[in-house]
Structure formats: structure tokens, C-alpha cells
Regions:
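Subset of outer-membrane beta-barrel
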Residues: 1-177
Length: 177
């Protein structure tokens, strides 16, 4: 990405941008499945000559209203699930054709008010993680750029029971443009 969305896709891409920019997106997510699910993104970046580029983004995903049932399939009411995350980004050129970037992220997930079945507690989590990115301009061909990112690096995500924690969905991505 060569705009404020770079903090999401590959923070290393921020290094090649000048000035400042604000970006916003709203998407009705999976509208054929449910009409109350949506995704929102707000991103910002500003370059500082000889220092690099800072930026960040906020993400909100509303998973809509859901029906709560107990372990005997008895109706218990309705609830709404949502997730939000914020990231602070920094990117710097290594030289004229290479750059690196880093995101520090904090996320909050609200899946349900209470535990399910015999579980006690709330179905929420607060977690942190990091993304790292690298970009190489003119890789193999003058007009071919290479991007590499590793996202969601951090500790396990735990809701009610830390013994049932799950790893963050860490991804290694390669891209060409």
C-alpha cells in the first residue's frame, strides 16, 4: 500500500510516503450472512524528513447480535460481539531502495458478557502484539517491489481460562507489486 493503509498491510511502506494523510473505510461485512456486521478502519500517517514516518490505525469489527443458548439449547437472550484494535507505526528507509517498519498493537475482543455452560467470568480479552515489515524497491526488475511482513507476533490470547489460551494468528506474508 502506498497510502495511510500501509500501517495495516506493511508498515515498511510508510517510509516512502511524504506529507500526511488520513484514511477511513466502512464495510458492511458479510451482508448476505447478517445485516448488522460491519468493519471500520481509520488510519493516519505523517512523514518527518530524516527521521522516518509515524502512523497508526484503529480497527473496529462489529460481529452483530447473536442468540445466547445454554448447554441444553435453552434460549438465554441476545448479545453483541465486537473486536477493536489500535496500532502505532514507525517506518524508516534503510537506503533509497529498502525500508523497515514496525507496528505495536493493542486489541480488545468482546465475544460474550458471560462464560458459556459452567464457565465463569467474561468472554473478553485485552492483548498486545507486534508486526514487522520490510520493503525492497526495484527487486529483480526496476519496477518490481518486494514486501515481507510478519504480523500478530505476541503472547497467547486468553478469554476466561488462561489454560485454554490460543496463539495469536501469526502470519508471514510475501507480496510483489
Amino acid at each position: 500500500a502506498n497510502d495511510a493503509y500501509a500501517s495495516y498491510w506493511n508498515p515498511a511502506g510508510l517510509a516512502y510516503q511524504e506529507g500526511s494523510e488520513l484514511a477511513f473505510m466502512h464495510v458492511n461485512w458479510l451482508p448476505n450472512l447478517a445485516d448488522d456486521m460491519y468493519y471500520e478502519f481509520l488510519g493516519y500517517r505523517k512523514s518527518f524528513p530524516n527521521l522516518g514516518t509515524i502512523g497508526g490505525h484503529l480497527i473496529y469489527l462489529n460481529l452483530g447480535e447473536q442468540v445466547r443458548m445454554d448447554e441444553y439449547a435453552q434460549y438465554q437472550g441476545k448479545f453483541t460481539s465486537y473486536m477493536m484494535a489500535g496500532a502505532i507505526s514507525y517506518s524508516q528507509k534503510i537506503n533509497e531502495t529498502s525500508s523497515f517498519g514496525l507496528n505495536a498493537k493493542l486489541s480488545y475482543q468482546h465475544l460474550v458478557e458471560l462464560g458459556t455452560g459452567s464457565e465463569k467470568g467474561k468472554g473478553t480479552s485485552i492483548d498486545f502484539g507486534f508486526d514487522v515489515g520490510y520493503m525492497k524497491k526495484g527487486w529483480l526488475l526496476p519496477t518490481l517491489d518486494l514486501g515481507i511482513t510478519m504480523t500478530n507476533i505476541g503472547p497467547k490470547v486468553s478469554f476466561i481460562d488462561p489454560d485454554q489460551a490460543d496463539p495469536q494468528p501469526t502470519n508471514l506474508t510475501f507480496g510483489f507489486a
